[in-house]
Amino acid sequence: MVSAMRSRTLSKDDVNYKMHFRMINEQQVEDITIDFFYKPHTITLLTFTTVSLMYFAFTRENTSQEDNIWKGILSVIFFFLIISVLAFPNGPFTRPHPAIWRMVFGLSVLYFLFLVFLLFLNVEQVKAVMYWLDPNLRYATRESDVMEYAVNCHVITWERILSHFDIFAFGHFWGWAMKALLIRSYGLCWTISITWEMTELFFMHLLPNFAECWWDQVILDILLCNGGGILLGMVVCRFLEMRTYHWASFKDIHTTTGKIKRAVLQFTPASWIYVRWFDPKSSFQRVAGVYLFMIIWQLTELNTFFLKHIFVFQASHPLSWCRILFIGIITAPTVRQYYAYLTDTQCKRVGTQCWVFGAIAFLEATVCIKFGQDLFSKTHLLYVFLWLFSVAVITFLCLYGMVWYADYCGQREKTFSECEDSTYNTDIPWHHIDKPVEAPVKQNEGTSRRKNRHKGKVTNGVGKK
């Protein structure tokens, strides 16, 4: 009996582990400004969804088979998202509302299940699904069939250079700005950028559109588009790191302008921490973890090009850019959870969103290999091994350079994320809000304090009045 009671008693390490994992898998809202948006409304939601389903089920026309299937699929997605809000974890983020990130996780689970479903179809059935979604895809052609790449690279003119600044160059720039906001490291961003250009060289024999002139690859892609996006993203990161996060409640704001500003700022991060992927005290496991991060990142990028090449749709088609947008959204909590798993010694397993993202990346690759056997039969295994080896070497050099920079180029002022090589601490909240300690107000100083209250520092654009 005593042994059974002991087995049910959690040790201090188990309690700390559960708390650390909950911080990255189900972050709680600590500063609730409007109680209505954070109170459970399960009975109301159940009543609304049930009545709505009954109404549409008995009142809509059901003569069209295609319309019935489409409306049924949308209803399944809608109710799955409702269940996601009720049952799934928040993830590491709480802004603008935890329910949004629960639905994001729900959409990632749906996409994961859809990829599993695709594995049990044949090529004709997959194309039938695509043609049902968009009949115009029957007449789609591959970009590599109508365009030439890496032709007359010795001809360098201003007109030719300016012709490359199209919508895709704009997408490269803003895409790398968002990647920098997610990764928050110059070293890793530049490493991924250079590694991707090498990835294009190693897989150029499979995808002809990877062939580029040297000046297009080095100057336009790496230096201008990627480099400019990285610089912009990191400047925003540094700005967010230096801000003071002291959120005012709606109840304490008495002006209309202040309430509007506070409502808009609800869509900004609740806090921002300085990220350090590697330091001199890191172990070999950290190096292997960063290498795995690089491989999955490159694999996700490769899936984008292989999917549109194998299933034949243009880069401008909604199937392409909607997937890119969706992957970008679920990457945010994934990187946050993976960084915590990699750097926090008390976090012993990855978060659920990170797990699903990894499964999606490998499932997409599996789908590409199954339905693109004719394409992958031309693969040179030597190039694949050289690619893996090159990524390993570049990753090691990147991490070594980051350690050298930390040792010889000056240490940054220690922040919460650097202390004890841990992202989290049991004694300090995750968001690390520094609130000034207010001295007790004397009786004869009350009037002067109230007069000078409006002259204090305004944080996050909202002042208390």
Curated annotation (Swiss-Prot):
Q: In what pathway does it function? A: Phospholipid metabolism; phosphatidylserine biosynthesis
**Bilayer topology:** Multi-pass membrane protein
The record places the following residue ranges in the Cytoplasmic compartment, namely 1-35, 90-102, 208-216, 308-319, 377-383
Sorted alphabetically, the keyword list is:
Endoplasmic reticulum, Lipid biosynthesis, Lipid metabolism, Membrane, Phospholipid biosynthesis, Phospholipid metabolism, Transferase, Transmembrane, Transmembrane helix
Gene Ontology CC terms: endoplasmic reticulum membrane
**UniProt record, GO biological process:** phosphatidylserine biosynthetic process
Catalytic reaction equation(s): a 1,2-diacyl-sn-glycero-3-phosphoethanolamine + L-serine = a 1,2-diacyl-sn-glycero-3-phospho-L-serine + ethanolamine; a 1,2-diacyl-sn-glycero-3-phosphocholine + L-serine = a 1,2-diacyl-sn-glycero-3-phospho-L-serine + choline
Q: What is its main location?
A: endoplasmic reticulum
The record's top EC class is transferase
All ranges on the Lumenal side of the membrane: 57-68, 124-186, 238-286, 343-355, 405-465
Give the EC number(s) under which this enzyme is classified.
2.7.8.29
Which chain regions cross the lipid bilayer?
36-56, 69-89, 103-123, 187-207, 217-237, 287-307, 320-342, 356-376, 384-404
- Subcellular location(s) of the protein: Endoplasmic reticulum membrane
MF terms in GO: L-serine-phosphatidylcholine phosphatidyltransferase activity; L-serine-phosphatidylethanolamine phosphatidyltransferase activity
Residue numbers spanned by region Disordered: 440-465
Q: Where is the composition biased (Basic residues)?
A: 449-465
Q: Which InterPro entries match?
A: PSS
Provide the family line.
Belongs to the phosphatidyl serine synthase family.
UniProt name for this protein: Phosphatidylserine synthase 1
Species this protein is from: Xenopus tropicalis (Western clawed frog)
At the highest ranks, the source species' classification is:
Eukaryota, Metazoa, Chordata, Craniata, Vertebrata
> What gene codes for this chain?
ptdss1
